[in-house]
C-alpha cells in the first residue's frame, strides 16, 4: 500500500488530530472519539483506527509500518514503546519536532532534496535513524535556510521536546537522548497497534 496523498482534512475528521500529516485540527466536537463510544465499535475497528493514526501521522506505507513493528518485537523492552521510539527517531520526524518543517511530508522533501546535514554530511534518507549526540543542520545555502525559515515562521509552534535542542539562528538541532514516551507527538495507544499486527508478525 502506497503512502497516503489524498485529502488530509478527511483523515483528521475520522481519526482526530494528526499533526505530522497536517497542522489543521478537527473542529471542536468533530473528533470521532467524542462522537462514538468505544463500546459501539468492534475491537478490530478500534485497533485498525489506532494503526491508521500511526501510519498517517508518520507518513508511512503499510509495509514500512509492519517492518517497524517486527523490528520492535525483536528488540528489548515493551514492543509498543520501542515502536514509538523507532518512529520518533526518524530524521524526517526529528526535523518536524524541531520545527524545521511544518509537517512530516515537508520534512521528507527537505531530506530528499538534500537540504539537510547530519554531523556535517548530507543525508537524503528520510528514514535515517537519529541517535544521541547527532547534530542536524540546514545546508549552508540561501534556499535551504529560506525553506526552514518559512516553517519556523508558520504557526502553530509546538514545544520542542526535551530529548531535542534547537538553535533557530544557526538552523541547528541536537539530539540529546532517545525520546521518552511522554514526549511522543501523537496521542496514541501503541499497544492496540501491536495487537493489530500480532498475527502478521508471527508469520
From Swiss-Prot:
Region (Disordered): 15-42
Pfam families, per the entry: Ribosomal_S4, S4
One BP term from GO: ribosomal small subunit biogenesis
InterPro entries, sorted: Ribosomal_uS4 (IPR022801), Ribosomal_uS4_bac-type (IPR005709), Ribosomal_uS4_CS (IPR018079), Ribosomal_uS4_N (IPR001912), S4_RNA-bd (IPR002942), S4_RNA-bd_sf (IPR036986)
Domain of life: Eukaryota
GO molecular function: rRNA binding; structural constituent of ribosome
Cellular localization per UniProt: Plastid, Chloroplast
GO cellular component: chloroplast; small ribosomal subunit
Keyword terms: Chloroplast, Plastid, Ribonucleoprotein, Ribosomal protein, RNA-binding, rRNA-binding
Name this protein carries in UniProt: Small ribosomal subunit protein uS4c
Organism field: Oenothera elata subsp. hookeri (Hooker's evening primrose)
Amino acid at each position: 500500500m502506497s503512502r497516503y496523498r489524498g485529502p488530509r482534512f478527511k483523515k483528521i475528521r475520522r481519526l482526530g488530530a494528526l499533526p505530522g500529516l497536517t497542522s489543521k485540527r478537527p473542529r471542536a466536537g468533530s473528533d470521532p472519539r467524542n462522537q462514538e463510544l468505544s463500546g459501539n465499535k468492534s475491537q478490530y475497528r478500534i485497533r485498525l483506527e489506532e494503526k491508521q493514526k500511526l501510519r498517517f501521522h508518520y507518513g508511512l506505507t503499510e509495509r514500512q509500518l509492519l517492518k517497524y513493528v517486527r523490528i520492535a518485537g525483536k528488540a528489548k523492552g515493551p514492543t509498543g514503546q520501542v515502536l514509538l521510539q523507532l518512529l520518533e527517531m526518524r530524521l524526517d520526524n526529528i526535523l518536524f519536532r524541531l520545527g524545521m518543517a511544518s509537517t512530516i511530508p515537508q520534512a521528507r522533501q527537505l531530506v530528499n532534496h538534500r537540504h539537510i546535514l547530519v554531523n556535517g554530511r548530507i543525508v537524503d534518507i528520510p528514514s535515517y535513524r537519529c541517535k544521541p549526540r547527532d547534530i542536524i543542520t540546514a545546508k549552508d545555502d540561501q534556499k535551504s535556510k529560506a525553506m526552514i525559515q518559512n516553517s519556523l515562521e508558520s504557526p502553530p509552534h509546538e514545544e520542542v521536546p526535551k530529548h531535542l535542542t534547537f538553535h533557530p539562528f544557526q538552523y541547528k538541532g541536537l539530539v540529546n537522548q532517545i525520546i521518552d514516551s511522554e514526549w511522543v507527538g501523537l496521542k496514541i495507544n501503541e499497544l492496540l497497534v501491536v495487537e493489530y499486527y500480532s498475527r502478521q508478525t508471527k508469520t
